[in-house]
A protein has these predicted regions:
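Conserved glycine-bearing catalytic or ligand-binding loops at nucleotide- and phosphate-handling centers
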Residues: 265
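Long, low-complexity segments enriched in small/aliphatic residues
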Residues: 2-25
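P-loop NTPase catalytic phosphate-binding loop
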Residues: 17-154, 161-261
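Long, charged, glycine-rich C-terminal linkers/tails
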Residues: 2-4, 154-157
């Protein structure tokens, strides 16, 4: 299939280009656009399926792959804000890097995009507030999963589809740039717990991870092992100027193509 969009409707969530005024009001179950997969004369979109039950993590090991990963995260945040209905969307953005790096500043996420969503941006000075929010999100995951099982549903998306508009629960999106910047082990462990079960409960974590970071548990002096966190995420690993996929369920097929993250509009 030479051109995916010849036979598939280009939506805000999955299309390569989109107009900020063209907002759609639905859960983006068709996937979020990450960039293009290219191989020979074939070009296909790389899509992240929010409903896969896994989070999404870009690994990076230098400034170039960091810029690529964070630019794609910005674009994903915009697509989420443009697609998920405002009364069902709680968008939390955490900047673990230098506050001067302008990742997802308020001026970039303008009111036309955000509408009345609960946009909350945290830097290192607000880590206590962010950690409290992680605790609230984890408690919410436990409660939601109980309600989902009682209703005999697979996940929150399926549960919400069976409820009236006023009864539907919000989807919560955590966008984390430059993890683990400024986060202590308590916050990291809580985030890991959220990633393990959060997607099915409508709590989604999309992040970039600085592989150069030295994370040590202050209690045991042992280094942090990221395997528990990353095993529950679709992971994109830097390979020169591109990235390869891990833990997507289709790694062997996808990695026959060259993938470069989509640049911001």
């Amino acid at each position: 299939m030479a051109n995916y969009y010849d036979s598939n409707k280009a939506t805000v969530a999955k299309s390569k280009g989109f107009m900020l005024g063209n907002q759609e009001q639905h859960f983006p179950s068709e996937g979020l656009y990450l960039g293009d997969l290219t191989g020979g004369s074939i070009t296909l979109p790389a899509l992240y399926d929010l409903n896969s039950g896994k989070g999404l993590c870009f690994l990076y090991n230098n400034e170039h792959s960091q810029r690529q990963a964070n630019a794609c995260l910005e674009r994903l945040a915009c697509r989420i804000a443009l697609t998920v209905p405002s009364h069902l969307c709680d968008l939390v953005i955490y900047n673990g890097g230098d506050p001067s790096n302008a990742f997802m500043v308020h001026s970039r996420m303008n009111k036309h995009i955000m509408g009345n969503r609960n946009e909350r941006i945290f830097f290192d000075g607000n880590l206590d507030a962010f950690r409290e929010l992680l605790n609230e999100a984890y408690a919410s995951v436990i409660e939601r999963m109980s309600n989902i099982r009682l209703a005999g549903k697979r996940d929150l998306v399926e549960l919400n589809e069976s409820l009236g508009n006023d009864a539907r629960l919000k989807y919560q999106f955590f966008i984390l740039a430059d993890f683990p910047g400024f986060m202590n082990m308590d916050a990291i462990n809580r985030l890991t717990q959220i990633v393990e079960a959060g997607s099915k409960a409508g709590v989604f974590v999309l992040m970039s991870f600085d592989m150069r970071a030295n994370i040590v548990d202050a209690y045991s002096s042992a280094p942090f092992n990221p395997q528990r966190l990353l095993s529950n995420m679709q992971v994109l690993v830097p390979q020169g100027n591109s990235f390869s996929f891990r833990n997507s369920g289709h790694d062997e097929v996808i990695n026959r193509f060259n993938y470069v993250p989509g640049a911001p509009d």
